[in-house]
């Protein structure tokens, strides 16, 4: 039985040098259809352009530009071969394709139960408070408030889901799949364990659905938040203004003041650091106000040299089966131990 487990966990899916470009080709074809043309995803083509226009500006003001002028230097700055051909990136690509199929089932589950129930809760809270109702169409001001309120509620719930993922040992074993990335590209966004993502999705959608139900009671004719390409305008703006640099090697800080409101790519780099001083920091998705309020914010004063990962042996997370099956094995071992604290790795 142990031999079979080793064979399964160490099964490698096309990460040898000769196969890398085959994997990339398959991924690219699927990716173009599934993500790049879909306006509701962070990996929509406009968001890529927004991020890498910013990256190009960063390059032009960097020392590298003045020492290595030319388009090849710019391309190597934005898309370094050692990162984009890294085993970790190849695993990101494979996981992204697999997860895209699993996500359809996951969202079917949460749309049937938690989201509908949360919407009803918000509706009945408003009714209990005896708030006034109007049959008039909501004004642009109401729609703007609704748009921001649903986003804030979703982000607040995301903050706590993310914090819990780093706090509870069993959940952390599943969240490790994302944090075990040794290098990061925008595709690392899709490197997650399906069970981890399902719980996150429930938290996020419950928050926004309760808020939506609350507004629906007061404005029965409200049709939804203000959107661009079916995406909340707040999210769309955040995505197009460089959010894809969060999972990258390119450092972008928002400065000491704006960073108290929004999570910058640099702050998310800190979150992915294996350095102990960076552990349990910057849990927010879009807004950093939650980290600020609850004492988990870390705003770097200047660029810091960061090693991405979780500080555990890389071979524990170097194959796709290990990233999917490993969390169940480790979680099961936690339940079997009488004293888990002595052996549970501290989440970064």
Give, region by region, the residue ranges found by the protein language model:
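Transit-peptide-like, low-complexity N-terminal presequences
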Residues: 1-45, 68-69, 74-76, 338-348
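Alpha-helical hydrophobic membrane-insertion segments
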Residues: 21, 25-29, 116-121, 125, ...
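Membrane-water interface of alpha-helical transmembrane segments
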Residues: 38, 85, 226-230
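Specific transmembrane helices
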Residues: 42-127, 146-154, 158
């Amino acid at each position: 039985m142990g031999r079979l487990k080793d064979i399964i966990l160490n099964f490698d899916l096309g990460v040898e040098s000769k196969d890398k470009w085959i994997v990339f080709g398959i991924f690219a074809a699927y990716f173009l259809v599934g993500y790049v043309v879909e306006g509701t995803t962070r990996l929509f083509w406009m968001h890529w352009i927004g991020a890498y226009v910013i990256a190009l500006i960063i390059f032009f003001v960097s020392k590298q530009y003045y020492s290595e002028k030319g388009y090849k230097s710019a391309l190597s700055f934005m898309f370094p071969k050692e990162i984009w051909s890294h085993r970790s990136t190849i695993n990101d690509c494979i996981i992204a394709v697999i997860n895209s199929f699993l996500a359809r089932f996951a969202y079917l589950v949460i749309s049937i139960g938690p989201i509908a129930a949360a919407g009803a809760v918000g509706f009945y809270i408003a009714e209990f408070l005896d708030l006034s109702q109007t049959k008039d169409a909501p004004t642009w001001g109401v729609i703007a408030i609704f748009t921001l309120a649903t986003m804030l509620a979703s982000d607040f719930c995301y903050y706590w889901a993310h914090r819990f993922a780093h706090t509870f040992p069993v959940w952390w074993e599943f969240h490790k799949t994302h944090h075990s990335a040794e290098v990061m590209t925008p595709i690392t966004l899709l490197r997650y364990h399906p069970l981890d993502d399902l719980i996150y999705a429930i938290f996020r959608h419950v928050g926004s659905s309760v808020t939506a139900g609350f507004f629906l009671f007061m404005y029965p004719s409200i049709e939804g938040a203000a959107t661009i390409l079916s995406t909340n305008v707040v999210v769309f703006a955040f995505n197009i203004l460089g959010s894809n640099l969060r999972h990258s090697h390119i450092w972008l800080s928002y400065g000491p003041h704006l960073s108290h409101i929004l999570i910058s790519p640099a702050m998310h780099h800190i979150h992915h650091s294996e350095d102990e001083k960076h552990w349990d920091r910057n849990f927010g998705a879009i807004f950093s106000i939650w980290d600020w309020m609850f004492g988990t914010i870390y705003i770097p004063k200047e660029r810091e040299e960061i090693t991405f990962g979780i500080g555990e042996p890389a071979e524990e997370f170097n194959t796709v089966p290990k990233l999917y099956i490993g969390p169940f094995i480790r979680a099961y071992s936690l339940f079997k131990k009488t004293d888990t604290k002595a052996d549970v790795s501290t989440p970064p």
